[in-house]
Amino acid sequence: TRZGVREDPSVRAIVISVGSGATKDKVGSTGAAAKALVERENPRVRAWVTERGIVARPPTIG
């Protein structure tokens, strides 16, 4: 795991919008569950758990 990445289910998730890959209904899910939902819904979106919640990022273009 990269430094600063946490898989702590007690962390409240905040899903940052990256288009259709992340939707507001996932806000409030626990970290691991929300991460799995985002990545299952759009496998090209990378999501990871931070201390502030879920951060999701679209794939790098290029």
Swiss-Prot record:
Domain of life of the native organism: Eukaryota
Classification via SUPFAM superfamilies: CI-2 family of serine protease inhibitors
This protein's UniProt keywords: Protease inhibitor, Serine protease inhibitor
InterPro entries recorded: Prot_inh_pot1_sf (IPR036354)
GO molecular function list: serine-type endopeptidase inhibitor activity
Annotated family: Belongs to the protease inhibitor I13 (potato type I serine protease inhibitor) family.
Listed name of the protein: Trypsin inhibitor MCI-3
Lineage: Eukaryota, Viridiplantae, Streptophyta, Embryophyta, Tracheophyta
